[in-house]
Amino acid sequence: MVTAAAVLEHLPTLYDYFVTSFSPVLSVLGGPGHNPVLDQLLPVVQRSPLVMCALIAWAATHRAGTGHPYHDVARVSAETVEMQIDSLDVTRDFSNDEREEYMWTLIILGGVEIVRGDSKGWVRRLPMARGMLERALQSVDFKSSPTWQSLAYNTAYHDILSVMAMTRGPKWPAVYDRILNHNNVEIDGYMGATRRIFYLLTEISTLATEVAATLELPESGDKDRELTDLVAGHEALLARLRAVDIPLGVFVQLPIGTDRSHLIVAIEVFRGAAELYLRHTVLRAASSDLQCRLIAKRLMHNLRLILGTPHESQMMFPLFMAGVYTSHDAGRTEIINISTKFSERTGVRSVIAIINLLLEVWKRDPDGTLYVDWRKLAEESGVAVSFG
């Protein structure tokens, strides 16, 4: 039996594994020897035993998932961290160092669950993460703090990509407007240059929730008027989505090893995914919808351009949305093959849950002619699906 003390024996090996082998799949930026995510995370790891333990849990979970004997180390270290976080009184005042420590710990625990393949704990802790982030940014100068920019972008990224599989979106934190529409031209390691599209995804989620609630109302003139307004909201969001462009100056100071062409392609990939999500959740477009099929085909063309690059770490949500609107066998086989190879290469088991969800969609729509509410299927599956 592995004890908490015995976990420390594995610390040097697992720390080195995280830094050199696992962390490169976490960032869409940089190249060999340069990872912007590590620049902000490692200083906190080195001063905080809690974050260090969380990091060991993450690395051990990933290592165990690739066939190495670290299951007990992963379990003990994760349980130790979860016990402390779940007993935390989030209403008390924290120092800035404590805020950083607890936010990184929450995020890393989410990463542990994504590697395991089920994000229930992350979803359960999301209100805590949102609340801590909002309170922190009331007193922190976001524009001048690379650490809090990294924490904020990381939280928003994983929050949004977890909520995409829910039929009822949350009340999004007001601070996400400030985070995702930040005027500075720097790009980040989680969303690259796609932050504004992520903000639109929060608005699409809200609109989709309103559509779902309205459709449940009894037939009436008021219901018809509400649906008309919601369709108008769809048109307005679609126009804003199509107008998203790369901010001026974004290429001035790129991290070493970053390919600007991949940043441009990633914007087109996420633009296509967001439009498919908008049409699916708001207009309830069936898989036979010609416009959606054309968008999916263009999305797949762009996505192939970033396979094997750091940007593929973002690709599961776009790939899934393309799959929903792909009806021919060859296209569906390609999507499964890409997903499977990505899961094998990265050791991230959340991809398996996404593949299983897509296979269930296709099982219910074998010919590509129906509307299948995959978000409802995801909720009924009992697995918390995360595209992050």
Residue ranges and their predicted role:
Residues M1-S27, G33-Q40, A330-G331, S339-G388:
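Intrinsically disordered, low-complexity regulatory regions with latent secondary structure
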Residues V2-T3, P36, V44, T167-P310, ...:
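Cytosolic regulatory protein-protein interaction regions
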Residues A5-L8, P12, G31, L42-P49, ...:
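Alpha-solenoid helical-repeat scaffolds
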Residues F18, L38-V44, A54-G67, A78-S119, ...:
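Hydrophobic/aromatic-rich effector regions of fungal transcription factors
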Residues C53, M103, W148-Q149, Y153, ...:
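Start-of-helix signal in alpha-solenoid helical-repeat scaffolds, especially tetratricopeptide repeats
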Residues G65-H71, R92-N96, D141-S145, E216-T228, ...:
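Short, surface-exposed loop/turn segments at secondary-structure junctions
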Residues D86-D97, S139-N154, G189-L201, F251, ...:
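Charged/polar, low-hydrophobicity segments characteristic of intrinsically disordered regions
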Residues T105-T209, V372, L377-G388:
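Acidic/serine-rich, low-complexity amphipathic helices located in mid- to C-terminal regulatory regions
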